[in-house]
Amino acid sequence: IIPNLQLNLERYVIHRLRKETLMADQMIFKRCEIKYMLDITQAELLKNQMKQYMTADEHGVSTICSLYFDTPDYLLIQRSMEHPVYKEKLRLRSYGTADKDTTVFVELKKKYESVVYKRRIAMTEDEAERYLLFHEKVKVTQITREIDYCLKNYKKLAPAVMLSYEREAFYAKDDHEFRITFDQNILWRNYDLSLCKGIYGEAILDKNKVLMEVKTAGAIPLLMVHFLTENQIYKTSFSKYATAYRTIYAREQRRSCPPENFFVFTGDEVVQQAIKC
């Protein structure tokens, strides 16, 4: 993209985002998302203390599957890891393993100055695949126009990383816009890239770790602030997709760079060669 054109595009998007309000009925969400890394003991203690002002989601623990789209050179996640003022991600999400007729969600997640703006549309897995991979036309809405622009702007977007995890969610009793989620058993893979393939892959976190996210359109309750302070729990910029990408990148580097010393066998002779990459 020409630099000036990219700059103008970002200015336009930022202008649009500043004007938006929360419109849940249109599946557009605006909120701040703050992440914390806890151990299991801390998570259980917090859940117990939250009972006085939070209620558990009616679905209990859910399994979430997210298929992230990116360019062949991982432009979207690389850009996100640079911590720019504005960034975006495109993903396809299901609750549990999908089949072709399962309702899934195409999500475009944008972030500007720590505020998250998420758009999503529901369709079957088969429809979503034909829409995202083969650009089959769907009903035109403001959300689909933005997704279409993303598909056009970033050339050759395709499934890049599959993530799955178990999530337990809680809502504030007096404000359903305030949510807290706990994610465990986070798995990733960069093969079998489909929501229909099942839940498996490599673990991102130790079994004792829990990723907590606070999602709010306003302030964090004082009880929550006190708990975090007393337990010395601090916010983190942890990203599931970025963590998976770092592993992918490290492995690609190892494959392209031979070890510093290796041996070549020629009959009875062993020749040691020092190779530096």
What residues fall within each predicted segment?
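Phosphate-end processing signature that detects enzymes handling 5′-triphosphorylated RNA
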Residues: 13-277
